[in-house]
Design a protein with these regions (language model features):
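Residue-level marker of alpha-helix boundaries and capping positions
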Residues: 53, 92, 114, 170-171
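Short beta-strand/loop segments at the ligand-binding rim of alpha/beta enzyme cores
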Residues: 110-112
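Asp-based, Mg2+/Mn2+-dependent phosphohydrolase catalytic module
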Residues: 1-5, 18, 33, 99, ...
Length: 221
């Protein structure tokens, strides 16, 4: 019997792709206020490509940006990291049905939670500005416990905290490895959100696929 429905955050409840587009406007306003609009667009494309949808070694990413661009006053990697961690959450773009979905699951008697990879400051800021934390019985951020998806331990840790077995949990996420393989290995029942950087990649016949987050309600009755 399913007792909990758990979610990834980025590209599952939050439209990270659109949030990143909004964040880049603040980034260039703060760090490159004097460059032309054409140069901003060129550098935005650099950030999209080298940022790899957020699946990147951030120190290497920042070093690439610093070294490959001309700067009037070049920031340090530490400054770029602090800016990203403290500003990105101000640009949350939550899928329109995310709050309604979580509220409906709560009304149906399910426990609801989020398991997300990322630095603690960044992810908690995003969660705080998302408006979704109030629906959650548990929030697990990998940076808080030093366990990262796809390690099955982060999924079993969450189930244990809820007083449940992994088999009693559904997990919804977009990443074919971090979310789907990880939750399967832990014993959870995954649902694939087919969106974002990994859309249409490595879909599995044994895992339900949804195109919109509200479609979870068609699977979890």
């Amino acid at each position: 019997m399913i007792k909990a429905v758990l979610f990834d955050f980025d590209e599952t409840l939050q439209d990270r792709t659109e949030a990143f587009e909004d964040y880049m406007d603040t980034f260039f306003s703060d760090f490159c206020p004097d460059i032309s609009s054409d140069e901003i667009e060129r550098r935005k494309q650099d950030m999209r490509i080298t940022g790899n949808g957020g699946y990147v070694n951030r120190e290497e990413w920042y070093a690439t940006l610093i070294e490959s661009w001309q700067w009037k006053n070049a920031p340090s990697s530490k400054e770029l990291a602090l800016h990203y961690d403290t500003k990105f959450g101000d640009h949350n773009v939550i899928f329109p049905d995310s709050a309604r979905l979580l509220e409906e699951l709560k009304n149906r008697g399910y426990l609801v939670g989020i398991i997300t990879n990322g630095p603690s400051i960044l992810q908690h800021h995003k969660l705080d500005t998302s408006g979704l934390r109030k629906y959650c019985d548990i929030v697990v951020v990998s940076g808080d416990i030093d366990i990262h998806k796809p390690d099955p331990a982060i999924f079993t840790y969450t189930a244990d905290k809820l007083g449940l077995k992994a088999e009693e949990c559904v997990y919804v996420g977009d990443h074919p490895v971090n979310d789907i393989q990880g939750s399967l290995a832990a014993g959870m029942k995954p649902i694939r959100m087919n969106y974002g950087w990994f859309k249409d990649q490595d879909l599995r016949n044994d895992v339900p696929v949804i195109e919109s987050i509200i479609d979870v309600l068609n699977i979890v009755k």
